[in-house]
From Swiss-Prot:
Annotated gene: nuoK
InterPro entries, per database record: NADH_UbQ_OxRdtase_chain4L/K, NUOK/Mnh_C1-like
Presence of keyword Protein biosynthesis: no
Descriptive protein name: NADH-quinone oxidoreductase subunit K
Enzyme category, top tier: translocase
GO molecular function terms noted in the UniProt entry: NADH:ubiquinone reductase (non-electrogenic) activity; quinone binding
Keywords per UniProt: Cell inner membrane, Cell membrane, Membrane, NAD, Quinone, Translocase, Transmembrane, Transmembrane helix, Transport, Ubiquinone
Length: 101
């Protein structure tokens, strides 16, 4: 049987992979969005693990709110990506300053 520490270690590894993904690739907007989503999923895994092992449902409810915010963040990020690619024909993060109104 898996204990709480196994889930927390898995969550920490996923979080570390996402942080490394953010620091190693600061140019591509798609990779940055995927790394941020992986970071949020690692946090959700920790919430679910704590909620299960403590017998409290509040952590599981909080995960639904995080998933809702993550979906909105992904939609806004992809909308910015589409506008950026349509106007500039590139998805490099360095070119985001040219989207000023």
């Amino acid at each position: 049987m898996l204990s709480l520490s196994h889930y927390l270690i898995l969550g920490a590894v996923l979080f570390a992979i996402s942080v490394v993904g953010i620091f190693l690739n600061r140019k591509n907007l798609i990779v940055l969005l995927m790394a941020i989503e992986l970071m949020l999923l690692a946090v959700n895994l920790n919430f679910i693990a704590f909620s299960h092992y403590l017998g409290d449902i509040a952590g599981q409810v909080f995960v639904f709110f995080i998933l809702t915010v993550a979906a909105a963040e992904s939609a806004i990020g992809l909308a910015i990506l589409v506008v950026m690619f349509r106007n500039l024909r590139t998805i490099h993060v360095d070119d985001l300053d040219s989207l000023k109104g």
